[in-house]
Design a protein with these regions (language model features):
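Single conserved hydrophobic/aromatic residue that forms the stacking wall/gate
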Residues: 117-128
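Conserved residues at the C-terminal ends of beta-strands
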Residues: 11, 66, 128
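Short, small/polar residue-rich loop motifs at catalytic or cofactor-binding pockets
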Residues: 2-4
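Asp-based phosphoryl-transfer active-site loop
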Residues: 6-19
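Basic side chains
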Residues: 6, 45, 123-125
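Active-site phosphate-binding/coordination module
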Residues: 23-116
């Protein structure tokens, strides 16, 4: 019985991307030449960051983004794991102590970079 590969998953930073953040030559062609194999991009990056890189072949990929927080296939949400508001506020409280940290709140359709997150009490701000 011949065994065949059914799924290939790969990380981006430090794995598929080289030191200049370039994809390997021929990667898109290789993916397109294996229609019976599912290819999964797994990354801590935001979904739309990955989509910008893989847009020409996006419909041939499954995206696990936000460190597993959002899984997308063919522009549809397969799975989403939201962070409860109380936990998000707890994290924002913690990182607000370091003025050199700018948290990114990843959402299904966009991400928010908290550049102005400087109030004395992060709880004064709404997560929604």
């Amino acid at each position: 019985m011949e065994k065949s590969i059914k799924l290939v998953a790969f990380d981006m930073d430090g794995t598929v991307l080289d030191s200049k953040l370039r994809l390997p030559k021929g990667l898109f062609e290789m993916i397109e030449s294996h229609p019976n194999v599912k290819f999964v991009v797994a990354s801590g990056r935001q979904y739309y960051s990955l989509l910008n890189i893989f847009n020409p072949i996006k419909d041939k990929l499954i995206f696990i983004s936000e460190n597993g927080g959002i899984i997308m296939e063919k522009d549809k949400v397969i799975h989403i794991m939201p962070v409860p508001d109380a936990k998000a506020l707890e994290v924002l409280d913690l990182v607000s102590e370091d003025k050199g940290i700018y948290p990114v709140l990843g959402c299904e359709k966009t991400s928010y970079i908290c550049l102005l997150y400087t109030s004395p009490s992060p709880r004064d701000r709404s997560v929604s």
